[in-house]
């Protein structure tokens, strides 16, 4: 899985690169900035719903900002899916599956995931099986009391303790985003206890481990986690992909994914009802 590709709504070359990457490797990550993907029609509404004073106004502003990021991330996701399927974004209908994972209605040849934080929007696409992505500002500090015990295995806590003090926060953030990505891919999210599985330290091949550190998954899972700079701001981006073993789908264009023979048979049956 390659590094995430920066994209804009009116870009061309980067979208060609994204589509070629998806076709060549079966998975692709793309990211954008909120200012580039903010839905124009929602600007005034977002601002008006955020107006207020004191604590209530601050809460409304926070909620409005979250809604704006969510709307922008869905706009980016729709564009990414449209490019992948060689269709118009107006033809894409996003929905959610039984576990709450985002999906493309009527299109099971591609799996999708998204994450948004601050001004960053991150989207993952795969034709191999399942995908989950997560992103956080690289300087975020996970400070909640006892957090490491709630989200890390004993083995992971030992690995973190072995790091120089200045690197522990970054190490914990890496684990957090990997766990978010993995549980998003399997459709569980934070419902799945984060201390029930783990990952090895940075520098080792990334694999899911049991709490005792023994491998829990094999080569069907692939991961990526790195720090990327977006307009001078560092973000930790992580992704998890599960290859379900059905082979890589190379033709996912909307116009060609239906078998011509099947279409002809269905059409003949429909004509017979007239």
What role is predicted for each listed range?
Residues 1-274:
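Core catalytic alpha/beta fold that binds nucleotide/phospho-ligands
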């Amino acid at each position: 899985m390659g590094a995430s590709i920066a994209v804009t709504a009116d870009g061309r070359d980067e979208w060609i690169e994204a589509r070629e990457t998806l076709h060549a490797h079966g998975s692709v990550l793309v990211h954008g900035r909120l200012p580039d993907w903010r839905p124009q029609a929602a600007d005034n509404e977002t601002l008006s719903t955020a107006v207020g004073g004191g604590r209530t106004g601050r809460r409304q502003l926070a909620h409005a900002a979250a809604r704006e990021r969510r709307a922008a991330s869905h706009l980016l996701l729709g564009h990414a899916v449209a490019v992948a399927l060689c269709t118009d974004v107006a033809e894409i209908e996003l929905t959610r599956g039984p576990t709450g994972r985002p999906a493309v209605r009527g299109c099971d040849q591609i799996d999708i995931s998204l994450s948004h934080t601050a001004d960053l929007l991150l989207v993952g696409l795969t034709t191999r099986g399942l995908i989950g992505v997560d992103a956080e500002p690289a300087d975020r500090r996970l400070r909640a009391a006892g957090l490491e015990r709630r989200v890390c295995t004993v083995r992971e806590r030992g690995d973190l303790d072995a790091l120089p003090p200045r690197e522990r926060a970054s190490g914990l953030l890496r684990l957090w985003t990997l766990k978010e990505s993995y549980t998003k891919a399997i459709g569980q999210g934070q419902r799945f206890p984060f201390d029930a599985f783990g990952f090895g330290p940075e520098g080792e091949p990334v694999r899911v481990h049991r709490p005792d550190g023994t491998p829990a998954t094999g080569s069907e899972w692939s991961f990526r986690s790195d720090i990327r700079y977006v307009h001078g701001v560092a973000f930790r981006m992580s992704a998890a992909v599960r290859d379900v073993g059905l082979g890589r789908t190379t033709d996912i264009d909307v116009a060609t994914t239906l078998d011509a023979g099947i279409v002809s048979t269905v059409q003949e049956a429909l004509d017979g009802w007239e």
